[in-house]
């Protein structure tokens, strides 16, 4: 099975990382509209926005509590997950990232040209 199928057939995704560079597992889970529990470390809070249940790292009790909370009110958390997918589409696509990178380069060049060197 591929990763998309595994996420899509899951009721909850749990990303309990102690550190994430970019956080592909978070983006993958959100892209598949799976209610997400993730640690509030590294880049994860920035990636998830308000579309995940964030917990402290190394807190297995929080994982249990968050899982029960999601499964007890699944429709609510599924709706959040659906909105989370839209968040990923709007904020983490190559066209947007490339444009932002391009703008940063242009602004840097402009600042350098305008500098009194």
Show which residues each predicted segment covers.
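Acidic donor-binding loop of glycosyltransferase active sites
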Residues: 8-21, 34-35
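Short hydrophobic beta-strand element within catalytic cores of glycosyltransferases
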Residues: 26, 35-38
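Short acidic alpha-helix that forms the nucleotide-activated donor recognition element
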Residues: 1-10, 31, 45
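C-terminal alpha-helical cap of glycosyltransferases
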Residues: 94-117
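Conserved acidic donor-binding segment of nucleotide-sugar-dependent glycosyltransferases
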Residues: 53-60, 69-74
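Conserved acidic donor-binding loop of glycosyltransferase catalytic domains
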Residues: 17, 38-40, 46, 55-56, ...
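A short, well-ordered alpha-helix in the C-terminal region of glycosyltransferases
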Residues: 69, 76-91, 97-103
